[in-house]
C-alpha cells in the first residue's frame, strides 16, 4: 500500500494567508486604498502594453511560428519600466530622508535604463536632444551676453544666413538620399510647385500661431487687430497722436481726416471688410514676397547641388553663391531663419550620426544625459 505524504503545500498556503491577513491588519484604510490604486495602475500598465504585443504575436502565429519566452520578455521588460516610472517616483517622494527631487528622478531613470536594451528609435533621441539643447541655449550666459551687446537685427540675421549655408553643405554630404530633409532641400521641383508649397507652409504656420494667440492670450478685439497689434487710427500711422493736433488752416481738412479715420477703422475690421480687402489682408497675400524669396533660394540650392555640376563646384564656391543669393533676394537682411526649420534640419543631422554610432549603451548614455539636462 502507498502511504500518503504529508500535505506540505496546504500548510504553506495557509501560512501565506496568515501573513497576508496580518499585513492587512497593520494597514489602515487609507493605506489599503493606496495599495489598491497601485495594484490597479500596475494592472492597467501591463494590460495596455499587452494589447500592442498581442498583434505581434498573432502575426507570428499566422506565419507558422511558435511564441517563445524571448517574445514575451520585451513586453515584461517595457511594462516594468512603465510601472517604475509611474509608481516609484511618487513613492520615493514620501520618504523624509530623500527630499531632493534630483535624487528621486535620477534614481528612477537609472533603474529604468538598466532594464532597457536601447530599443528607443534614434529619431526620438535626436528630437529630445535638440530640444533640450535649444531650451538651454535660450538661458545660457553666451546668449545673455549677446543680447547685452545690442547687435543690430541685420547683423544677427546675416550671421544666421552664413550658418544656414554651412549647414546645407554638411546636410548634403551626410543625409541619406531617400530621407525627407534631403528631398525637401535638393530634389528637383518646378518653380511654381516650390512657390505654392512654401507659401502654403507659411500660411499654415501663421494660422497656427494666430489660433494659439486666440486661445492662450488675453485681450479684447477693441484694443487689438487681426495681427495682434494695437489698433491705431490713420493720424497715428502718419506720426501724429491725434488728428486734432494737425496744423489745420481750413476747417474742411478736419472733416477729411475724420472720414479717413472712419475708413481706416472699418478696413481693419474683418467683420466689415469686403472680399477684396480680405484677400489683400490674407496670409497668402502677405506671404507672397517672402515665399518668392525662399523659392528663389531653394531653386539656387537645387542648381548648385545637381549631379552634373557636383564635380565642377567646390563647397567654398557653393557657399559663396548661396550667400550672394541671400544678398540679392534680401539686401536689407530681413529674412529670418525660422527656429522650426532650423531644429528640423538639426534633428535630421543628429539622427544621421546616431544611426552611424548607434548601439545600446550609447543610447542609454544620451537618454541619461537628456534627463539630467531637463532637471538641471
From Swiss-Prot:
UniProt keyword list: Membrane, Transmembrane, Transmembrane helix
Does this entry carry the keyword Transmembrane helix?
yes
Q: Where are the transmembrane segments?
A: 153-173, 188-208
Is Cell cycle found in the keyword set? no
Task: One GO cellular component term, please give it.
Answer: peroxisomal membrane
Q: Where in the cell is it found?
A: Membrane
Query: What's a BP term from Gene Ontology annotated to this protein?
Result: regulation of peroxisome organization
Mind telling me what this protein is named?
Uncharacterized protein YGR168C
Q: From which source organism is this entry?
A: Saccharomyces cerevisiae (strain ATCC 204508 / S288c) (Baker's yeast)
The taxonomic lineage of its organism, from the top, reads: Eukaryota, Fungi, Dikarya, Ascomycota, Saccharomycotina
